[in-house]
């Protein structure tokens, strides 16, 4: 994408070095609707000479928010939210104030945690329209979610039901970034669920850690077969990546006994003091060190 605009890109060891004397508009066709690729090409194209068309662009709300931000600074971007984004380059940008949208994955993580611990929480400030696919899955699992004037009330008083099939896919379908968290919920469900990962390879690293806590999950290529168990048990587990770490925190709050989550730096990449967020909701969780969280049964 950036090379099509005229950038010289070289790999040097663990670094990627990009140089350009001038960027020129071009048609960029993405083989996959990558959020990061779409955003980087959009940002590069706003000051490029001429028009850039991104075909096969990602459609996530963050793309639409970036378009609003860039246009407020003087850019000329249109089409965000569709599969074609068009950018007409401008000579310069100006500063300004901009309020970003709520993080839908953080909101979704909270919703799943409430469901897994059988809580009752009202959530303000999120955007339910960005969470439609998650809400649909959780309602199938028997979780009560009421939305009124943008305010969500999530309540769960019984064991969740299995969901026959959940498939990750680019927005507006079910997000891969909530796959691990929802798998934790389904590990406690009554029945067998199937989670199919179609976005990233190797994104089931949390399965082994959940199984340490008593989950019954079998992985076959990009499919995870989840046979729900009545309860999980506290253990020492490792956050192998950002969303896996969040899932293990949820598991620790839902499990019987004491859970230690290690390698917390992965979680800190996407959640600001996750332990404080869950403590405000009644979770018994503390940060023992920069790399260890300790969670106790929140029920």
Spans of model-derived segments:
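Structural preference for solvent-exposed beta-strand-turn elements
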Residues: 1-299
């Amino acid at each position: 994408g950036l090379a099509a605009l005229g950038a010289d890109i070289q790999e040097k060891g663990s670094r990627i070095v990009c140089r350009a004397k001038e960027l020129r508009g071009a048609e960029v066709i993405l083989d996959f609707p990558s959020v990061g690729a779409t955003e980087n090409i959009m940002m590069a194209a706003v000051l490029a000479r001429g028009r850039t068309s991104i075909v096969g662009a990602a459609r996530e709300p963050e793309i639409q928010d970036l378009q609003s931000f860039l246009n407020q600074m003087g850019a000329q971007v249109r089409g965000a939210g569709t599969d074609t984004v068009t950018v007409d380059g401008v000579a310069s940008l100006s500063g300004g104030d901009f309020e970003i949208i709520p993080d839908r994955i953080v909101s979704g993580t909270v919703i799943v945690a409430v469901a897994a611990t059988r809580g009752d929480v009202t959530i303000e400030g999120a955007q339910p329209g960005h969470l439609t696919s998650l809400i649909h899955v959780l309602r199938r699992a028997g979780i009560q979610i009421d939305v009124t004037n943008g305010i969500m009330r999530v309540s769960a008083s019984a064991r969740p039901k299995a969901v026959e099939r959940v498939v990750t896919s680019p927005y507006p379908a079910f997000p891969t970034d909530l796959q691990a968290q929802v798998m934790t919920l389904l590990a406690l469900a009554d029945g067998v669920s199937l989670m199919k990962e179609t976005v990233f390879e190797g994104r089931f690293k949390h399965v082994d850690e959940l199984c340490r806590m008593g989950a019954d999950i079998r992985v076959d290529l990009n499919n995870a077969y989840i046979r729900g168990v009545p309860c999980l048990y506290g253990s020492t587990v490792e956050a192998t990546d950002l969303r896996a770490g969040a899932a293990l925190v949820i598991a620790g709050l839902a499990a019987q006994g004491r859970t230690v989550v290690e390698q917390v730096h992965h979680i800190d990449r996407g959640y600001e003091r996750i332990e404080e967020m869950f403590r405000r909701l009644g979770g018994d969780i503390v940060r023992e060190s920069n790399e260890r969280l300790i969670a106790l049964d929140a029920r």
